[in-house]
Amino acid sequence: MVKNSFISVISQEEEKEENRGSIEFQVFRFTNKIRRLTSHLELHRKDYLSQRGLRKILGKRQRLLSYLSKKNRIRYKELISQLDIRESKTR
């Protein structure tokens, strides 16, 4: 069920080649990497280098999401609902 939604999102994004640098596409790619690393770490709990990589990718995605929420709140809400991500906490 989740894979189908990602396939539809990526097919929409890949139709427009010029949008590969867009924030939405970057967040989508980071989310896929995060989900792959999370499933890998469920099997290999002591893979500390992968844990570090996961934390770095999480930070990058968080920075992009915070930038998007400041610049365009509507696009941010749509992206979060499409990718099934929790909304970040505001300080």
From Swiss-Prot:
Signal peptide extent: none
InterPro entries cross-referenced by the UniProt entry: Ribosomal_uS15, Ribosomal_uS15_bac-type, uS15_NS1_RNA-bd_sf
BP GO annotations: translation
GO terms for cellular component: chloroplast; ribonucleoprotein complex; ribosome
Pfam families listed in its UniProt record: Ribosomal_S15
GO molecular function, one term: structural constituent of ribosome
Residues in coiled coil: none
Protein keywords: Chloroplast, Plastid, Ribonucleoprotein, Ribosomal protein
Subcellular location(s) of the protein: Plastid, Chloroplast
Subunit-structure text: Part of the 30S ribosomal subunit.
Membership in a protein family: Belongs to the universal ribosomal protein uS15 family.
Protein name per UniProt: Small ribosomal subunit protein uS15c
Gene source species: Eucalyptus globulus subsp. globulus
